[in-house]
């Protein structure tokens, strides 16, 4: 049974539509002396784009199957995931409740009210603030219980949409990448931001089957490689099991030198990467995820960390709305 056929066994809403572009970054390639390509998941069609829409195709389909009328999720005040979940809820006529934290403890007005947070108000989200998401699964379960007591039928969407069901979205994306690359380019490496781990795990499972010669590198955005690896591995294993795969799982490669000082806080290397891509290619990265992932790619080339010198694919997971929240730092 093909990977495509296995995916059809899971209910899925068509939210992404056509395949997102896969393009060569010609000016960046000339600048670096290395072929760099980009998968433009920043231009998925709902609410200013981003990778979470692929996960929500499966998660929202499951919510509707279960008869839910409310999506309950959590994240940072500037969460791209919460923004996209809220937009999908609005599109489907569902209520949305979001549990938010301020992970960087800032009082800057732009962070508290602009960017993704502004969009939550437009989508009519019921926002609940908490001190910290120390145990998000338990906190979401408790919030769902309260929502249910109010007469709603909640469906919990995990942080980042990252569980085995949501990660199917990036198995699906792997099929897109393989089809777009076929006969055109043979990638030696694929670089992606690794945070809640679902995108990374989905690509790990999909690309292992479809582009086995490409090394997948996750650039961590919130924790060390030792802390991140079990998170990726847990979803990777659950995903492979759900798809009936019995082959040994692909090795998890993580680079963790680019997320400091912490999740959600910009750093010089990430901001430099944002400015470089904007000025060379007219493409916007963000200071939380893709800026740091691109910083990893740039440093990886400079430090000769890639396994060979073939073309590199960068997965652009979106996040540009957060730029407005981080002014004037960016």
UniProtKB/Swiss-Prot annotation:
Residues bearing the modification N6-(pyridoxal phosphate)lysine: 52
Protein purpose: Catalyzes the alpha,beta-elimination reaction of D-cysteine and of several D-cysteine derivatives. It could be a defense mechanism against D-cysteine.
Protein name (database record): D-cysteine desulfhydrase
Organism of origin: Yersinia pseudotuberculosis serotype O:1b (strain IP 31758)
Catalytic reactions on record: D-cysteine + H2O = hydrogen sulfide + pyruvate + NH4(+) + H(+)
Taxon lineage: Bacteria, Pseudomonadati, Pseudomonadota, Gammaproteobacteria, Enterobacterales
Keywords: Lyase, Pyridoxal phosphate
GO MF annotations in UniProt: D-cysteine desulfhydrase activity
Family, per entry: Belongs to the ACC deaminase/D-cysteine desulfhydrase family.
Family matches, as InterPro entries: ACCD_DCysDesulf, D-Cys_desShydrase, D_Cys_desulphydr_bac, TrpB-like_PALP, TrpB-like_PALP_sf
């Amino acid at each position: 049974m093909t990977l495509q056929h296995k995916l059809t066994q899971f209910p899925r809403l068509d939210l992404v539509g056509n395949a997102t572009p896969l393009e060569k970054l010609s000016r960046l390639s000339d600048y670096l002396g290395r072929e760099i390509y980009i998968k433009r998941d920043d231009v998925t069609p709902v609410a200013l784009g981003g990778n979470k829409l692929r996960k929500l195709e499966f998660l929202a389909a499951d919510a509707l199957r279960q008869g839910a009328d409310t999506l309950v999720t959590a994240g940072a005040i500037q969460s791209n995931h919460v923004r996209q979940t809220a937009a999908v809820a609005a599109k489907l006529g569902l209520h949305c409740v979001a549990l938010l934290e301020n992970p960087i403890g800032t009082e800057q007005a732009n962070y508290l009210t602009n960017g993704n947070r502004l969009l939550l108000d437009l989508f009519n989200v019921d926002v609940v603030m908490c001190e910290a998401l120390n145990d998000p699964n338990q906190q979401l379960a408790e919030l769902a219980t309260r929502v249910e007591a109010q007469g709603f039928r909640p469906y919990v969407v995990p942080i980042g949409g990252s569980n085995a069901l949501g990660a199917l979205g990036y198995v699906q994306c792997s099929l897109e990448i393989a089809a777009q690359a076929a006969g055109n380019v043979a990638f030696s490496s694929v670089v992606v931001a690794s945070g809640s781990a679902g995108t990374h795990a989905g690509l790990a499972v999909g690309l292992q089957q479809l582009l086995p010669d490409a090394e997948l590198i996750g650039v961590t955005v919130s924790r060390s490689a030792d802390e991140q690896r079990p998170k990726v591995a847990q979803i990777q294993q659950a995903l492979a099991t759900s798809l009936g795969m019995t082959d040994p799982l692909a090795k998890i490669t993580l680079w963790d030198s680019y997320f400091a000082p912490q999740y959600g806080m910009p750093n010089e290397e990430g901001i430099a990467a944002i400015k470089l891509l904007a000025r060379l290619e007219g493409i916007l990265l963000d200071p939380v995820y893709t800026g740091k992932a691109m910083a990893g790619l740039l440093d990886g080339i400079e430090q000769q960390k890639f396994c060979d010198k073939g073309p590199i694919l960068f997965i652009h997971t979106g996040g540009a709305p957060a730029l407005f929240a981080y002014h004037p730092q960016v």
